[in-house]
Design a protein with these regions (language model features):
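Gly/lys/ser-thr-rich phosphate-binding loops in alpha/beta enzymes
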Residues: 67-97, 311-337, 342
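Conserved non-cysteine loop/helix-boundary elements of the Radical SAM core domain that shape
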Residues: 110-126, 147, 151-173, 181-305, ...
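Flexible, acidic/Gly-rich N-terminal and inter-domain linker regions that tether
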Residues: 1-217
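Short, functional N-terminal and low-complexity linear motifs
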Residues: 54-59, 91-100, 132-140, 221-224, ...
């Protein structure tokens, strides 16, 4: 049914020389006729069209995908699984040798970003490239990227690894731009050819073919400073970068290094504002460490996103509510953002 839909809409748009509004009405009508479960984006229609028909379709359909509503597209990538510097908290599900296998700290391996990372062996270049491809195919223009580096306490990892990880994440954005954009417009035909589209999403042969080509591009010589400079004029710009850390690794020295990588926000693993609760889950630091870390990171200019957990051992509903009041009434805390975990 899908193939019949795409064939009919392409032929009708070209033969009847429809306007944009007419094409939109036709799309809805044909979706009903062919019993499609969702309405394809304009770019999906062009991806399904023959090369000779694309110029005619471009005059009717949008020439490039729409932006995300906020104007910024989030790209979340995972660093490789590594041991937490203090050991494992009692409530942490992931990490090396966990019941879920070797997965990033604090994750189960079932999250979309984790599954994407596992597919690409935690390679930042491949993770970013894959996410950018997904954005284009689903009709979004990822020209402004907020990069979120997940997977545990990133500042605890070897500084060479951190540098290389960010370098290749930025290189993926820059290479994607230089490969598929011409005069600020997406070269749809080149994009189709490189990613072998349209094609089955989970086809291993297709994935292997694309991965081999990407690895060849990735290996060209570069440095973090070079990729940061390239990104200033890239069509895919990194406008924000987030790293995750425990408070005891979120101090001034690590903060300064994170700034050199380009980080603008820190997701801080606060979890609780009560020493007895932190002690009960073997957190390995106290509330004062959270306060000191928050102050030092703010002084460096970072925005702070606290991770906070409810229902921890040693806590209660009443204590959780009290904790929220402390978070927002006490000036030692007051995060810019908050992630709540059960």
């Amino acid at each position: 049914m899908e193939s019949e839909f795409f064939s009919e809409i392409v032929q009708t748009i070209i033969q009847q020389k429809l306007s944009k509004s007419q094409a939109t009405k036709l799309k809805l009508k044909l979706c009903s006729k062919h019993k499609l479960k969702r309405v394809p984006t304009d770019i999906e229609i062009m991806l399904r069209a023959e090369e000779q028909n694309i110029p005619s379709l471009k005059r009717v359909l949008q020439t490039k995908p729409t932006r995300s509503i906020s104007g910024v597209a989030v790209v979340a990538i995972m660093c490789k699984p590594h041991k937490c510097p203090h050991g494992r908290c009692t409530v942490c599900p992931g990490g090396l040798d966990s019941e879920f296998g070797d997965v990033p700290q604090s994750y189960t391996g079932k999250e979309p970003a984790t599954m994407r990372a596992l597919r690409h062996d935690f390679d930042p270049y491949l993770q970013v490239f894959n996410r950018l491809e997904q954005y284009i195919v689903t009709g979004h223009m990822p020209d402004k990227i907020e990069l979120i580096i997940m997977g545990g306490t990133f500042p605890s990892m070897d500084k060479r690894y951190q540098t290389g990880f960010v370098k290749y994440a930025l290189k993926a954005m820059n290479d994607f731009s230089s490969m598929f954009f011409r005069k600020n417009n997406l070269n749809l035909q080149k994009f189709k050819e490189f990613f072998e589209l349209p094609g089955p999403v989970g086809d291993e042969k297709r994935i292997d073919s694309i991965t081999r080509r990407l690895k060849k591009v990735k290996l060209s010589d570069s440095s973090l400073a070079h990729e940061q400079k390239r990104n200033e004029s890239s069509n895919i710009k990194c406008v924000g970068m987030t790293v995750e850390t425990r408070p005891d690794y979120g101090r001034t020295s690590n903060g300064i290094f994170a700034l050199s990588l380009g980080a603008t926000r820190v997701e801080l693993g606060v979890e609780s504002v009560f020493d007895d609760v932190l002690d009960k889950i073997d957190r390995g630091h106290d509330v004062q460490e959270i306060i000191d870390s928050s102050r030092e990171l703010r002084d460096l200019g970072f925005k702070l996103n606290f991770h906070y957990m409810l229902g921890l051992p040693g806590s209660s509903e009443k204590k959780d509510i009290e904790g929220f009041k402390i978070l927002f009434e006490n000036p030692d805390f007051r995060p810019d953002m908050l992630k709540i975990y059960p």
